[in-house]
From Swiss-Prot:
TPR repeats lie at residues 693-726, 914-953. The gene is EDRF1. It comes from the Eukaryota. This is Erythroid differentiation-related factor 1. One of its GO terms (cellular component) is nucleus. Keywords: Activator, Nucleus, Repeat, TPR repeat, Transcription, Transcription regulation. GO terms for biological process: positive regulation of DNA-templated transcription. Pfam families: EDRF1_N, TPR_EDRF1. Coiled coil: none annotated.
Length: 1238
């Protein structure tokens, strides 16, 4: 039995298992193969049974010694009551196999096989209890059992009423139960002593077993001491046979567990309940279980020889058994029994033997018959034959029905975890009652008078802990785990068990995943999934004997209102599925796991607070702590910026912070409360504080997403205060915790930045920041016991100064980055590292823009002084430094797009510097300065770097287009300034013209007029303006230049080309009629200038004709102006129509009037010159129909124009209408003349 194979995992069923019967081992199999079980048919009734030995402490099986006939069993063998390896560790106490179980035997097994409790197994109990339950319909004996529910598992233990009431007489602990029992069940209870026959049978059985393992078959005299102990056993065993019941929640003294201590004949007292460390419970590292079993144990040992996972039909049971099993030779596994030949085997005995063999998977039974202690014969009986023995006939199918009904009854009614239920049947009664002892106990003065409370609480905790530690545990069980822990907490007194309470609260907080949004789950758990399966376990009793005396029955069972449920007749248990349909399984109290972020975090914090209270209450040095009232709000200190020193003061605070972080790496430790490092209080408080910091971080992140920035800052402040306390307590900072801190500071930086950008709602943010819940105050009070919590005050103050907020945000990101440098966190968390550097680059851009805008504001306020102030220069330096650092941040993570944006902003800063250096004196004397040129060229360099950073437009088209536009603007601005304020004192005119031309052409290069975008009209306007300026420049050069005819011709061609391009581009725009008109008038002037150098009338007429064509093409511009004036004229409902027409807000009225006057004069001049030339030509030539038509048309138009211009009262709109009309006639006349020629 001691082979390692016995503890192996259950294997697949073989053989006839698929056929659904019951199988036992054949003669050639050993017990180790029992895990393979299959099926056997018993008397025509199919009953499936499967037994897997999960643990065995028995020695290797040996054959029993077959005693010679006439051996006198009344004589003690030489080895009697001495420890024997063949009988295992229970050798000296076995007294046969009728040893009583201990009050908490199921708990010992549950602790050892914690994986099975709550889910896989229906019942955990001693085999004797199982047998006693299954014999209820057949037996008149009393039944008294304690029932506890853990998940879907029931724990059954014998509740020895006689033992309890004897204790009550001595200590008064169970007075309430004794009074209840006497009132409702037996009014005249008195202790019943066991008969001499009972002790005779136990002694003769014990001697028989020792003879069987001795092997010599001889009776040998024993010492007088042994005889005395045998004779005294009848008096002593009554008190010592079972375990002593402990006073509720007493810490026990140490009790010897050495088996040799009881070798004098009496059974040993079990040690008071000290739950040892359970080696078989899984201990995984993913959940820190800070509860030390040994410190709060109540000695619940699993001391069964073997623990068996027994499946009886659909009922799964974990059963403890001490039955000796013999083997060897022809019989590899047999059980050994002693029977009086004069007493036939009855049904109770048969069921007893059959169940023992089924549970232990023993195929055969060897029966030794005796008469008056004299051995007569041996008989071999197969297990499957036991139900058909003479005088012992019973139906295995009925036994199966009984088992299923009892389990269904118990599961339907024992619904409250943590409650102790009492299943009771009086001797000779047919009524079975179920009481809730916990409810009855609560009616007494001290509700902790239940000795089951502590073992149940520990088991609830252990099951929950075991479920939590399984990495593959589905989250649907979290509701079950929470229920287990809450029920555990209900059972415990806060003042007596702070460690368990703190640990359970910590585990409750661990149930809620804070790092990701919780998806909605149905809280389906083992507690909600009670099946009608049932397994019950009984301890072995001597059939037909009533060891505890007789119990009278109540006169009317229906009068018992205290009972939770009643089986009115034990005969009902034999009816198939009697209780499956009648007793509905009540839903468990499994709480759904919430999925709202704030609710989840608040629940976590409530558990953390309870845990912290438990820890704090257990620390004795209360008098050494500063007084604090949890109900008094702890002020969140708010310092004025002047006292804190602004952004400059942050440098010193950051240095102190980084020095502190460095010291943590060296393992420094400081606590104000005097906690001892390594103590459970220290370990637990560390974990609880860390959990609170995580919860506050998640709350802050959630508030941030809701744009509640004041609330977010309050939560991140609490998170950092928690972390600061953690740092004070921690002796060895884990990299994971440092990563948390880096994340907290990153979020804090985000919040400070958003507060800076949302200054208009500052009052609301300030109110949210200063609000505190009572829960937050109490947590903070606990934190203040260990630390001042001021380590991160520099990061969490709500400032009213924009610069300070931006600086604090930047310092938060810098601190987060510094933390990543302390260990290998940077390489281990590349995503977080990239995010931190992105934020550093972004905040430095924000600060750079802030200083740049301040510099621009100072510049705009500067009126007379031409020199740049020191304040401006200082702001430039700060801005440039921020941009430079930000660019480095983005380049280090290869973020080309953001690097390009910062390079673009640096270019803008250079342009502001250039603008600051322009002369502010007399505009007429101003020249483009070298400083302006220097800064504009620097700006161009930064824009070109930005383009090189992006590489191609495909990477980020919007940024690419923006940089191109800024670059084009810079070239255009520089060229315009050089053209308008030519530095003639330093450079020759030709050089200036060359530089202007080059800059304008480069501006055109980066001005994309073809791509369709929102910026396209601006690009078209910019390009048209550049062409106009270039044309004007070449026009001016042509006017001023003499000599070099080749150069003059070149300038003439360039001017005409650029005028033409400018006109085409302005023609595309709907909102630039004045610009188009100006370009066309300049083109006319250019034509007039050309005409002055012409000598022939033909050439002049050609030039005049081209000029008039240009005039005709201005009709589009006048139509745009006309349309706009008409639209504006129609808007006013009353008033002067002329005033309304002239008061155009979108048109520059003066500009239009000026251009209109010039246009009228030039048109008049061109028409007059045309008339003169055509008239002189007509005198020299005749029959020129075209010229006659043109001359006639021009005269008619000229006369109309003169009359129109003579009318000084005409409105702008009327004058525009005339021009449009005349231009239409001019265009028609030209077309008519062309047709006439054809």
């Amino acid at each position: 039995m001691g082979d390692a194979k016995e503890a192996g995992a259950e294997g697949p069923p073989a053989g006839a298992a698929a056929r659904g019967g019951l199988s036992l081992l054949s003669q050639g199999e050993s017990e180790e193969s029992s895990a393979q079980g299959s099926a056997l048919f018993l008397g025509g009734n199919e009953v499936k049974s499967r037994a897997v030995v999960k643990y065995s402490s028995a020695p290797p099986r040996t054959a029993f010694a077959r005693l010679e006939e006439k051996t006198d069993l009344k004589l003690p063998p030489a080895n009697w009551l001495r420890e024997s390896a063949k009988l295992g560790p229970a050798g000296t106490t076995i007294l046969g196999n009728s040893k009583k179980s201990k009050p908490f035997s199921s708990f010992g097994m549950a602790y050892d096989f914690i994986d099975s409790v709550g889910n896989d197994v229906d019942v955990v109990s001693d085999s004797e209890n199982i047998k006693k339950l299954l014999k209820i319909p057949y037996s008149k004996s009393h039944v008294s059992m304690a029932v506890h529910r853990i998940g879907r598992t029931l724990l059954l233990d014998e509740l020895d009423i006689q033992e309890l009431f004897m204790r009550s007489s001595q200590t008064g602990d169970w007075t309430w139960l004794k009074e209840f029992y006497q009132r409702l069940i037996d009014q005249k209870w008195q202790r019943k002593k066991k008969s001499k026959e009972h002790w005779y049978q136990k002694a003769i059985l014990s001697k028989f077993l020792y003879y069987s393992i001795n092997g010599d078959g001889a009776a040998q005299p024993v010492s007088s001491t042994a005889e005395q102990q045998e004779s005294s056993s009848s008096d002593q065993t009554n008190d010592s046979e079972g375990a002593s019941w402990p006073a509720p929640f007493e810490m026990p003294s140490s009790v010897s567990e050495d088996p040799s201590a009881s070798s004098q004949g009496s059974e040993p007292l079990e040690p008071s309940y000290i739950v040892g460390h359970v080696a078989s419970a899984p201990k995984e590292q993913n959940l820190i279980t800070l509860f030390n079993d040994g410190e709060h144990s109540q000695g619940l040992k699993n001391d069964f020889v073997r623990n068996i996972l027994w499946t009886f039909e659909d009922i799964h049971m974990l059963v403890g058994s001490n039955m000796p099993i013999f083997g060897g030779g022809r019989y590899p596994a047999v059980s050994l029994r002693l029977r009086d030949n004069n007493k036939p085997i009855n049904v109770l005995t048969g069921i007893d033997y059959w169940l023992d063999n089924l549970i232990c998977n023993v195929p055969e039974l060897v029966m030794c018959f005796h008469v008056n202690g004299i051995v007569q014969k041996y008989e071999m009986i197969k297990t499957e034959e036991i139900p058909n023995l003479e005088n012992s006939n019973f139906s295995t199918k009925v036994i199966k029905d009984i088992a299923q009904n009892i389990l269904s009854f118990l599961k339907s009614n024992c619904t409250k975890e943590g409650h102790t239920y009492w299943l009771f049947k009086a001797s000779g009664s047919d009524i079975v009652k179920l009481y809730d002892l916990t409810t009855l106990c609560e009616e007494t003065e001290d509700k902790y008078q239940n000795p089951f409370t502590m073992p149940v609480a520990i088991l609830l905790y252990k099951v929950a802990c075991n479920m939590m530690m399984k990495k593959n545990q589905n989250k649907k069980h979290y509701g079950t785990i929470r229920t287990l822990l809450l029920n555990c907490l209900k059972l415990l007194d806060k003042s007596r068990h702070p460690q368990i309470i703190a640990s359970a609260n910590y585990m409750l907080s661990e149930l809620f995943q804070l790092d990701e949004p919780k998806k909605e789950e149905n809280s389906e758990s083992p507690l909600n999934e009670n099946s009608d399966e049932s397994y019950s376990e009984e301890e072995e009793e001597m059939p037909d004997s009533d060891e505890n005396g007789s119990y009278s029955t109540s006169s009317d069972p229906s009068d018992d209102s205290k009972a939770v449920a009643i089986i009115k007749s034990v005969g009902e248990l034999s009816v198939p599925e009697k209780y499956k349909s009648i007793h509905q399984i009540r839903p468990s109290c499994a709480f759904p796991v919430c999925h709202d972020t704030e609710e989840r975090c608040r629940l976590v914090l409530s558990y953390v607070l309870e845990g912290l209270k438990s820890v704090d209450s257990s620390i004795k040095k209360e008098s050494d702590l500063p007084a604090a009232d949890p109900s008094t709000p702890i002020p969140l200190k708010y310092e004025d910026e002047s006292s804190r020193g602004g952004p400059e003061g942050l440098e010193k605070q950051m240095a102190l912070f980084l020095d502190k972080m460095g010291s943590l790496q060296k393992g420094n430790y400081s606590s104000q409360s005097g906690m001892i490092p390594g103590s459970w209080q220290h370990k637990m408080k560390l974990q609880l504080i860390l959990k609170s910091s995580k919860a506050y971080y998640v709350l802050s992140d959630a508030a941030m997403s809701l744009q509640k920035y004041g609330r977010a800052l309050r939560y991140i402040k609490l998170a950092l205060q928690s972390h600061d306390t953690y740092c004070c307590l921690c002796t060895n900072m884990l990299s994971e915790v440092l990563l948390f801190l880096s994340q907290y500071l990153t979020l804090c930086g985000d919040i400070q930045l958003m507060l800076a950008q949302n200054a208009n709602n500052r009052a609301a943010h300030l109110e949210e920041f200063h609000y505190q819940t009572k829960e937050d105050q109490e947590i903070l009070h606990s934190l203040h016991r260990e630390s001042s919590c001021q380590g991160f005050a520099w990061a969490t103050d709500l400032s009213t100064d924009l610069e300070s907020q931006l600086s604090v945000s930047c310092k938060c990101y810098e601190a987060a980055n510094e933390i990543l440098q302390f260990s290998d966190l940077k390489s281990q968390n590349p995503e977080h590292y990239v995010q931190v550097l992105k934020r550093m680059g972004n905040i430095r851009n924000e600060i750079g823009v802030f200083y740049m805008n301040q510099a621009a504001a100072l510049q705009s306020e500067r009126l007379v002084s031409k020199s740049v102030s020191a304040a401006e220069q200082q702001l430039w330096k700060k801005s440039f430094s921020c941009f430079e650092k930000g660019i480095h941040n983005f380049e280090s993570i290869e973020d080309a797009t953001n690097a390009a944006l910062l390079l673009c902003n640096t270019g803008r800063l250079m342009r502001i510097c250039a603008q600051a250096h322009c002369g502010a004196g007399d505009e007429l004397k101003r020249e483009f300065s070298p400083e302006e040129g220097l800064y504009y060229n620097k700006a161009i360099d930064y824009y070109l770097k930005a383009l090189r950073s992006l590489g191609t437009r495909d990477i980020h088209p919007a940024v690419w287009d923006s940089v191109n536009w800024e670059l084009s603007t810079t070239y255009f601005t520089m060229a315009t300034l050089q053209q308008d304020y030519a530095p003639l004192s330093r450079k020759a005119q030709e050089q200036i013209e060359k530089e202007v031309s080059e800059a304008m052409m480069k501006s055109l290069k980066y001005c994309d007029v073809d791509s369709v975008s929102a910026r396209q009209p601006l690009c078209q306007y910019r390009a048209a303006t550049i062409h106009h300026r270039l044309a004007s420049m070449y026009h001016s050069c042509l006017r001023n230049q003499v000599g070099d005819e080749h150069l003059r011709k070149q300038h003439r061609v360039l001017a005409d080309l650029h005028y033409s391009k400018a006109a085409k581009l302005f023609q595309l725009l709907k909102d630039a009629p004045c610009e188009l008109l100006r370009v066309q008038l300049e083109r006319v002037a250019f034509a007039e200038f050309q005409m002055t150098s012409q000598n022939s009338n033909v050439g002049k007429l050609k030039t005049l004709s081209g000029a008039l064509d240009i005039m005709v093409r201005t009709e589009h511009a006048f139509q745009l102006i006309q349309k706009e004036l008409i639209e504006e004229f129609g808007q006013p409902k009353s008033g002067d129509a002329a005033a309304a027409a002239d008061a155009s807000p979108s048109l520059n009225r003066e500009e239009v009037m000026k251009l209109l006057s010039i246009f009228e004069s030039r048109l008049s001049f061109l028409l007059l010159q045309s008339i003169k030339l055509l008239s002189s030509t007509k005198k020299k030539t005749s029959n020129n129909i075209e010229d006659d038509t043109i001359l006639k048309t021009n005269k008619h138009i000229y006369s109309q124009l003169l009359r129109a211009t003579a009318n000084k009262t005409a409105t702008l709109l009327e004058r525009i209408n005339v021009i449009v009309h005349l231009l239409g006639q001019l265009a028609a006349g030209s077309a008519a003349s062309s047709n006439a020629v054809q």
